[in-house]
């Protein structure tokens, strides 16, 4: 999900972002 501005993100979100290669938060 949109982790924009959200300080705490679920590990599932991080995993999804990592898989998308956009884990540059």
UniProtKB/Swiss-Prot annotation:
Domain of life: Eukaryota
Protein name per its UniProtKB record: 20 kDa neutrophil cationic protein
UniProt organism field: Sus scrofa
